[in-house]
Amino acid sequence: MQVRTLATITTDTTVDTRVPTQNYQRHPEMVLQVGITGTITVQILGSLDGTTWVEMLAASAASQLSAAALVPHVRIVTTGTSGGTAVVKVGTGQGPRA
């Protein structure tokens, strides 16, 4: 599993992270750790295949998780005013793995 930690992002900020295709194939699971000062929306953008999934593992101040389309391109958008940390897991295959 590849773990990527993104810098803390603040309210009303959008962070895009693109996973290189070769890395995505080598590491079918990726964990994004995001420090947030607002609620969080995570979108999978584009088109890769029909088996991409996204899972909110933990979120002390996250109220929304939105998966749209399928590709190793993750957009993290924060809104609102509450603080906390969110851990989001994305990958390909049959679904989240333990």
Located regions from the model:
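Surface-exposed loop/edge segments in extracytoplasmic proteins
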Residues: 1-6, 50-58
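Short, solvent-exposed loop/turn segments in extracellular or other extracytoplasmic domains
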Residues: 12, 58-62
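A short, compositionally biased N-terminal segment around positions ~18-40 that is enriched
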Residues: 20-38
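Noncatalytic modules at the cell exterior or secretory-pathway interfaces
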Residues: 26-32, 68-87
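Conserved Ser/Thr-centered positions that define the repeating blades of beta-propeller domains
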Residues: 45-47
